[in-house]
Amino acid sequence: MKPSAECCSPKFWLVLAVLAVSGSKARSQKSPPSIGIAVILVGTSDEVAIKDAHEKDDFHHLSVVPRVELVAMNETDPKSIITRICDLMSDRKIQGVVFADDTDQEAIAQILDFISAQTLTPILGIHGGSSMIMADKDESSMFFQFGPSIEQQASVMLNIMEEYDWYIFSIVTTYFPGYQDFVNKIRSTIENSFVGWELEEVLLLDMSLDDGDSKIQNQLKKLQSPIILLYCTKEEATYIFEVANSVGLTGYGYTWIVPSLVAGDTDTVPSEFPTGLISVSYDEWDYGLPARVRDGIAIITTAASDMLSEHSFIPEPKSSCYNTHEKRIYQSNMLNRYLINVTFEGRNLSFSEDGYQMHPKLVIILLNKERKWERVGKWKDKSLQMKYYVWPRMCPETEEQEDDHLSIVTLEEAPFVIVESVDPLSGTCMRNTVPCQKRIISENKTDEEPGYIKKCCKGFCIDILKKISKSVKFTYDLYLVTNGKHGKKINGTWNGMIGEVVMKRAYMAVGSLTINEERSEVVDFSVPFIETGISVMVSRSNGTVSPSAFLEPFSADVWVMMFVMLLIVSAVAVFVFEYFSPVGYNRCLADGREPGGPSFTIGKAIWLLWGLVFNNSVPVQNPKGTTSKIMVSVWAFFAVIFLASYTANLAAFMIQEEYVDQVSGLSDKKFQRPNDFSPPFRFGTVPNGSTERNIRNNYAEMHAYMGKFNQRGVDDALLSLKTGKLDAFIYDAAVLNYMAGRDEGCKLVTIGSGKVFASTGYGIAIQKDSGWKRQVDLAILQLFGDGEMEELEALWLTGICHNEKNEVMSSQLDIDNMAGVFYMLGAAMALSLITFICEHLFYWQFRHCFMGVCSGKPGMVFSISRGIYSCIHGVAIEERQSVMNSPTATMNNTHSNILRLLRTAKNMANLSGVNGSPQSALDFIRRESSVYDISEHRRSFTHSDCKSYNNPPCEENLFSDYISEVERTFGNLQLKDSNVYQDHYHHHHRPHSIGSTSSIDGLYDCDNPPFTTQPRSISKKPLDIGLPSSKHSQLSDLYGKFSFKSDRYSGHDDLIRSDVSDISTHTVTYGNIEGNAAKRRKQQYKDSLKKRPASAKSRREFDEIELAYRRRPPRSPDHKRYFRDKEGLRDFYLDQFRTKENSPHWEHVDLTDIYKERSDDFKRDSVSGGGPCTNRSHLKHGTGEKHGVVGGVPAPWEKNLTNVDWEDRSGGNFCRSCPSKLHNYSSTVAGQNSGRQACIRCEACKKAGNLYDISEDNSLQELDQPAAPVAVTSNASSTKYPQSPTNSKAQKKNRNKLRRQHSYDTFVDLQKEEAALAPRSVSLKDKGRFMDGSPYAHMFEMPAGESSFANKSSVPTAGHHHNNPGSGYMLSKSLYPDRVTQNPFIPTFGDDQCLLHGSKSYFFRQPTVAGASKTRPDFRALVTNKPVVVTLHGAVPGRFQKDICIGNQSNPCVPNNKNPRAFNGSSNGHVYEKLSSIESDV
């Protein structure tokens, strides 16, 4: 047959190829890639077990199938191992090796590392020497070991020591490779740990030297720590332990911890290894050799499978050990990356870069007394689990065990023992806690599981245990009891802490263990370290605030003492000091005091002190005495302390509530008969304790009832109390007090504030007949003696609620607390009494020396006063010895003058009984006056009741003692400055207001320059020009040497000045005062008077203008008076009326009409030379015409003169103010100084300082009835403007009136229209007090022999003005005395000396001889008893009878009195207003 053509066709070969490929794919699916792995076992390994392990079908899910070659070897030398592995590579084409041996030779691991680095074959050492620690592996090696690294084993060692609180240790190593890593790992761990490690020694032993054991012994003797870490080989460890045993480092109290390298094969234990040796080893029990072989095969297979999956190839098998291709190196490095990260069956089998397992299975083994390794712990997932909660300290049987390490049991019960968990960060207990083990009781528990949990204990009893252990010097292991609580005997067996001690599982029991008789039978108790007993806790009830809570801050003694000091002592002391003080309310040592005025009573003193204590803003009257002020000041300081202390404690007592306990004690009816209450009273306790035992033994019925309400623990009982399930909880007092203090919200309290029943104490239970009891007792007593026990109690047993209670409850301030302030009040009273005595001594004895009397110089008081004044006002004080010693300086001294002024004002204010009259002087004075008392700053004068009375005749020589004193003192002084008194009063005592009715006539030439205290630079003229001749020379000689002002204030009479002294309180005067009317335009002057302020300054202005008008000398056509620098003076006063910025706008009135109708008369007077002061030579005799008078109108004073009077006056020059004829005044002198001609006065008027007589005002008064005509003759040549009385009366109607006050009385009487009822008068018993020796007794009496002016006057008067209250104001008599000796402002040398010495004036009364005044050659001849005839005209009722109103003002031309004026020192007529300002200037 012939072959077919189809067989050779191309289609045929294609089918064959497809079939071939399909066949190859089928074969590939049936047989996956495989990897050859050799398992080499050295020694007596169980091959059957290994075979079963790798034959199991555990790798079917992998893409690579392991092809295992099982090889057994007996030789362990390096040559045999290398030859056998190389043969397997060439014959079996293996790609990995799993090596296991049963030796302790670490050299096998080094050989395997070398083979792997040369052949690039992965080798796994899983057991024996191949798995031992190896340091410094080759970088290209693929050798991996089933075992922990050096660092891992060092960490486990530290965890073991931390578990049992072994913080003090030492390290011993040899030069075996890896020792540096071991030491460095331990150092770095303890440095970065929170545990307080103490590494004492690090010993490096050199085992290569053959110098015997001496060197190693010397090194080991340095070790003192109880824990020693050893790193070396097993052979080296055998030698080291032998030497350590010789030096006593392997006995009881020393613990050695070694790594797995030392332990080696656990089946063989060298005899040198000490009992109790601890080793960290690979887990041989739970991770045996078959499991390791299987995991080794799985690691290589899984890595190859992962490589195949990612790269589609696996490493090619190696055919020889002697050649290595680059391709093989690449594949081996790639496989190494997969070998490091392997996970098999959910287990992490990864390796580190050094070839060690990342998560090895380690165990802690202990060499027990049977010389076998016992597994006591496990290290898994970086956590340590130990079998023993108290480390069993083992020692050789030949040695006796020392009892210095004790096992102590405790019970959790705050605050005595508080159990906490370990710190989650460090896994250890904090520094203030102690590790304590808690057993785990579980039915399903296996032997491998640990039987305890590590906890941390702290508390009051734990701190006591720590202190006792340091004192007695023992160590301990602490664990928590699990069998019961404190301890109770059940069926003859004790449980709890007492049971642990009885069974000798613990040496001691520490905690809240109550000492009782039953327990003391089986154990010994130490002395009690805290007192306790049985207490009852209840829920807090609602409290109430006591009604007397506001009194609680102070005790009753303090309240009583305060009121006693207030009402009896302090108030009485202030009143007494004030009453007897020289300047107090109730003393009248100063004559200016108003009798019957305000007084300081005992009631006011109590009211004042009461207001100071309680800060009451009620009106009180303050004392004035220095002593009483000191007392009140100290009382105010006491009030501050008292009130501050009261306020500080008041809030605490006001919020403090009183709580009522529900039960009073264990014998309370609620406990003994709980069912009698509705609902029944519920109470219970924690069973199996001393509290239950006590109740059972003493209260059987109570114990039976409370069984159903017993609680499992204290926390459960507290919760039941808060929720209302329980009414009372009976338990240990110390525990309940702590719980009450720490309760949230402080809702739970113990009855009776911690009342204790059946008192006992807590103690430490010790084994019976133990040697520790005495040492423990002494240690506890030492804690009490050192005060440490009190510190522990304050730290642990004091709760928050106790602190809050202490903060709220404030103890009462008893008398001891407030004693200091009462002592202060007593000292203040003593000081006040001393001050009171010193005040009177100074006032009555030493005051005069401080005034300069003793030294003759200005006193200290004067110097200080003037020094302060000089500092404030800048006034220089001249205290030259020559000046101050002169009599003139003494009388010109401002200080002396002011003192006299004050003395005079006081005497004026206290007049009572005028010349024996039953009426008081105060009846004539108005209380509402603006004039104030100098010393008291009060209004001291009252208005008159306008009743007339008969003035009793005065004695002729009433003031003879003053006259005698003046004569005796100044009789031999020469004449000096006769006008100085007049000039002094011109400058300093000016009227303040317009008090009388007058009109403005003639030309106004008033010179009132601006006020200044500086002396004027005006050229002086002799003051003795125009003085009278020998008739008054003796009088001038008597007074000329003393003046109130020095020569610097003297000047021309034609330029009358208006000075004020340094103590003046006058106001600025307004007005245009130029004297020449020809140079003044009418409209300009009228405009200057428009809308001037209607204030006190206006009244002052009118007084100045009128006074200047009255002072203006007579004028003649050829004698005119001119001012210096008139334009400047006029501009100055025009500026006074211009509105100024920042000044108040006064109410203005238009006064232009006052001068409107008089302007023409002024011009005529100016042309004719006439005026108010017309020369007497121009008067005619024997005619009815009057020439040279004002406006041709006869003045009222002219009507009082007869023809004979006019004839007498026409022949010569007369006094300006009185009828005295000036015989020694020549016409030559008058011609030289015409300005002084019309204002010349007699010596009597000069001495009195009178500017005018009061009767001069009669020329300005309007008469309601026409006066009788008086024929007056005058020269026809001088008659210019004759006018009849009718024309004069008509002209007066057009005049505007101004009221001017000329005296103190008239000023006060200005406000009489609004006066109220008459004030109280001075009692009659004070009538004679001011009469004898008073310089003002003359004010309300007339000279002897005169009954009234109306009967003796030769001039017709308007009779209806007499004693008519409604007739208008009348010019009253000046307050100044009528005689020169009565003038208090004219001091005498004797007066001055008496004032300096602080004594009364030594005036003496002499009997007056009838007619002596007519014959005596001295100035007494001037005193006359003739009546002074005055006619008063006015629209205002007079203050006194007209017969006692002596005139103080006269017409400047002709006097209205025929008789010469008596030397009247009181006729000045000036008023001192607001004397308080004068006093303040002093």
Swiss-Prot record:
The chain crosses the membrane at residues 558-576, 631-646, 818-837. A motif (PDZ-binding) lies at residues 1480-1482. Changing H311A: Normal zinc binding. Residues 577-603, 624-630, 838-1482 are cytoplasmic. Zn(2+) binds at H127, E284. GO terms for molecular function: beta-catenin binding; calcium channel activity; cell adhesion molecule binding; D2 dopamine receptor binding; extracellularly glutamate-gated ion channel activity; glutamate binding; glutamate receptor binding; glutamate-gated calcium ion channel activity. Residues 1292-1304 are annotated as: Interaction with DAPK1. It is found in: Cell membrane; Postsynaptic cell membrane; Late endosome; Lysosome. The record marks N615 as: Functional determinant of NMDA receptors. The modification Phosphotyrosine is found at Y962, Y1039, Y1109, Y1133, Y1155, Y1472. Disulfide bonds join C86-C321, C429-C456, C436-C457, C746-C801. Phosphorylated on tyrosine residues. Phosphorylation at Ser-1303 by DAPK1 enhances synaptic NMDA receptor channel activity. The keyword Mitochondrion does not apply. SUPFAM superfamilies: Periplasmic binding protein-like I, Periplasmic binding protein-like II. Keywords: Calcium, Cell membrane, Cytoplasm, Cytoskeleton, Disulfide bond, Endosome, Glycoprotein, Ion channel, Ion transport, Ligand-gated ion channel, Lysosome, Magnesium, Membrane, Metal-binding, Phosphoprotein, Postsynaptic cell membrane, Receptor, Signal, Synapse, Transmembrane, Transmembrane helix, Transport, Zinc. Residues 1-26 form the signal peptide. Expressed in the hippocampus including the dentate gyrus (at protein level). Detected in adult olfactory bulb, brain cortex, hippocampus, striatum, thalamus, superior colliculus, with much lower levels in inferior colliculus, midbrain and cerebellum. Residues 1290-1301 have a biased composition (Basic residues). It catalyses: Ca(2+)(in) = Ca(2+)(out); Na(+)(in) = Na(+)(out); K(+)(in) = K(+)(out). Residues 27-557, 647-817 are extracellular. Residues 604-623 dip into the membrane without crossing it. One of its GO terms (cellular component) is presynaptic active zone membrane. Belongs to the glutamate-gated ion channel (TC 1.A.10.1) family. NR2B/GRIN2B subfamily. Heterotetramer. Forms heterotetrameric channels composed of two GluN1/zeta subunits (GRIN1), and two identical GluN2/epsilon subunits (GRIN2A, GRIN2B, GRIN2C or GRIN2D) or GluN3 subunits (GRIN3A or GRIN3B) (in vitro). Can also form heterotetrameric channels that contain at least two GluN1 subunits and at least two different GluN2 subunits (or a combination of one GluN2 and one GluN3 subunits) (in vitro). In vivo, the subunit composition may depend on the expression levels of the different subunits. Found in a complex with GRIN1, GRIN3A and PPP2CB. Found in a complex with GRIN1 and GRIN3B. This is Glutamate receptor ionotropic, NMDA 2B. The gene is Grin2b.
